[in-house]
Amino acid sequence: MSNIEERVRNIIVEQLGVQLEEVKNEASFVDDLGADSLDTVELVMALEEEFDTEIPDEEAEKITTVQSAIDYVVNNG
């Protein structure tokens, strides 16, 4: 697991209050991890802060799974 992947997973655990074992790459924040719309906004904000980047709203809407969050940070962070 890469450092970025590990950091993204830790943010998800902290923001959504889930166990690390639940944070699988294919897991949907809403369907699998129980996030609501406010949780997803806060998650994106936490990613922006951790990786010192700004995620435009249209891109943030596409970040719906653990893997999509990792991919975004790897490609744009």
UniProtKB/Swiss-Prot annotation:
Pathway: Lipid metabolism; fatty acid biosynthesis. GO terms for cellular component: cytosol; membrane. The keyword DNA-binding does not apply. Signal peptide: none annotated. Keywords: Cytoplasm, Fatty acid biosynthesis, Fatty acid metabolism, Lipid biosynthesis, Lipid metabolism, Phosphopantetheine, Phosphoprotein. One of its GO terms (molecular function) is acyl binding. This is Acyl carrier protein. It comes from Psychromonas ingrahamii (strain DSM 17664 / CCUG 51855 / 37). The gene is acpP.
